[in-house]
A protein has these predicted regions:
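Residues at the starts of beta-strands that form the adenosine-phosphate
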Residues: 2-3, 27-29, 95-96, 134
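Active-site-lining helix/loop region of Rossmann-like oxidoreductase modules
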Residues: 7-12, 145-147, 152-195
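Glycine-/Pro-rich loop/turn segments that contact NAD(P) or position catalytic residues
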Residues: 76-157
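NAD(P)H-binding glycine-rich loop region in Rossmannoid oxidoreductase-like domains
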Residues: 4-5, 31, 36-91, 106
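Short, well-ordered alpha-helices that flank and scaffold nucleotide-derived cofactor binding pockets
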Residues: 19-23, 27, 87, 130, ...
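N-terminal Rossmann NAD(P)H-binding glycine-rich loop of SDR-like oxidoreductase domains
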Residues: 4-24
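Conserved beta-strand segments of alpha/beta enzyme cores
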Residues: 28, 48, 134-136, 187
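Residues in the short beta-alpha loop(s) of Rossmann-like NAD(P)-binding domains
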Residues: 10, 35, 103
Length: 195
């Protein structure tokens, strides 16, 4: 049984991943978010809710103690969040990180140049890649709300094979990576629906 810390637990992908973890695995979840009142109907026998901010290093470290996997699905100051996550994981001995980023951070989307808008994603990925963590960075295509699990992955340096992906597909990959922590270690994966 894995103990998983979910940072940004109220995000749309995170909520789908939480449902999948609870239905398909025996994982124990710690749901970390700024406003806990946003989460409803959480199975308290398998999920602990912590109200906190990734900028609060002491609370973040406390939440990481005893965890096997950290899954981060955040928006905001991604560069500082990545620094804090790496520091807190190093301090608590947690090695496995699944971090959601964005397609385009390596100019891997044919015909598209996203420029400086993706700088926070690029910088956070660089911080994680420079760490000694057992990370997997996910770079999803544009999100859809389709109720489907249909995706392919690409490695860093390979062009994307599509432009969209369902949130449910991303959640499925997150659960697979968390349940099989030896998969795709120290990799940055693009994820999209095949076209």
């Amino acid at each position: 049984m894995n103990n998983i810390l979910i940072l940004g637990a109220n995000g749309q992908i995170a909520r789908q991943a939480i449902d999948m973890f609870l239905k398909e695995t025996d994982a124990q979840l710690t749901l970390y978010l700024r406003r806990s009142s946003r989460l409803e109907n959480v199975d308290s026998s398998r999920a602990q809710v912590i109200e906190g901010d990734v900028m609060d290093m002491e609370k973040l470290k406390e939440a990481m103690i005893g965890k096997d996997v950290v899954y981060a699905n955040l928006a905001g100051d991604l560069e500082q969040y990545a620094k804090n996550i790496v520091e807190a994981m190093s301090a608590t001995g947690v090695k496995r990180l699944i971090f959601i980023s964005s397609m385009g951070i390596y100019d891997e989307v044919p015909g598209e140049k996203y420029g400086s808008i993706l700088d926070p994603y690029r910088k956070s990925a660089q911080i994680i890649e420079a760490s000694d963590l057992e990370y997997t960075i996910l770079r999803p295509a544009w999100f859809t709300n389709s109720d489907e699990i249909d995706y392919v992955t690409t490695q860093k340096g390979e062009p994307f094979k599509g432009s969209v992906v369902s949130r449910k597909s991303v959640a499925d990959l997150i659960v697979k990576l968390a349940e099989s922590p030896e998969l795709e270690v120290r990799r940055s994966l693009g994820i999209n629906k095949p076209e």
